Amino acid sequence: MTSAPSAARIAPAGRPYTPLVGEYGDVRELTVVAARPEPVTWQARLAAVPVGLAATGVLAQIAHPLLDGSSLRRATVTAVLLLSAAAVTHAALAWGVRAAATLLVTAAGLGLLAEAVGVATGVPFGEYSYAGTLGPKIGGVPVLVPLAWTMLAYPCLLLGRRLGGNHGTAGVATVGGLALASWDLFLDPQMVADGHWTWLFPHPALPGVPGIPLTNYGGWMLVAPWMIAVLHQALPRDPVPERVPAAVLAWTWLGSALGNLVFFGRPWVALWGGLAMGLFVAPYLWRLRRHEREERL
């Protein structure tokens, strides 16, 4: 009796192959079982949640140039809710629910505190007041505003850790905080133009960016590093996947620059914000990309 070959015989093109009885000794039939794809795990499904939230939030922002009035306000509220939820759920998947709650309470709480003091006293941003366009308020501050702090504070914390982590808390707070503050060069002109808040004394201002006093940017450069320092101390230091937060930062930087330049007619805002935010986001994206390449080697 001859032994069975190590591989099945290949049939001629277009014809099924059926082995004859006794052709392989005692083999009576040949059964081929196709490999089944691995089932999608619940962890993979959960990992898609912050991706979906962030992507939907970005889509809401992309629609801004096409909207006005109440539709624009709804899109603004929706984008902040979705992007802040993306930050919190990403932190929950990376570090656990307790850390995510710490992120939300700390960032939103400090943001609310700074804004409430600012509205009441004019310190540290200057004298300003919110309109009634962003929903319910606490202490004169719309609830949405602390969530806006949260949605960018988280990715800026990760940016600060990657770019300034070798210099301890001071390095993380300085780099991450200034990155967060640079965002306001886009944020304030947009919100003032949309009528969400107004400044009592809007001068002196940046060239080409009327309506927002320089004191506002100074206030951000005080509050944002303080917030990042507290978050750095309060949250775990374990490395996390950074693609979703990095994508949010990249979109905020490039999308805001493009929107102000092309759609909103604010070229100076595009210039100031694009340069300032690019000083932090561009090196961060480059460093993150290099790190991912090194990990694959």
Q: Language model features by range: what are they?
A:
Residues 2-297:
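Aromatic-rich, lipid-facing transmembrane alpha helices and their immediate juxtamembrane interface loops
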